[in-house]
């Protein structure tokens, strides 16, 4: 699943509907791989560990909000549909599960000039959660850049919206070549 070309399943331009019970230990890499096919998908519905779903749908300023939240919410409108208790399985797992529905956002709403750069900026911002943006994004932005963006460099990444991250990435992309 991590190397499969999901685009090869698209027939006559009909979008895919992806449904599954993802292996909890590799769910995040699978979700990132599937995000690359958002333009070929009508919707996706998965059962995952509840903790992962809460991170996927996390809001800015919450403990759950992080890299997974930003990168998936950039590409998808998501909602937790319902929880599945351990007792629904035999043998019962030690964790609660949740069902999440993911619908790709229209391409017009996905305005990052460079998706890979967006990923790098988000990864940097959340790489050290307790550090401020001034420190985590110092390879990308200086004080003048923060001022131009209207973003307080004293904030932490968890306080920024998905759109804030897109604005930062687009600003950085417009400045030219970036660090490796």
Regions found by a protein language model. Give the residues of each.
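C-terminal lobe and adjacent flexible extensions of AdoMet/dcAdoMet transferase-like proteins
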Residues: 104, 122-180
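Catalytic cores of RNA-modifying enzymes
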Residues: 1-123, 147, 167, 177-180
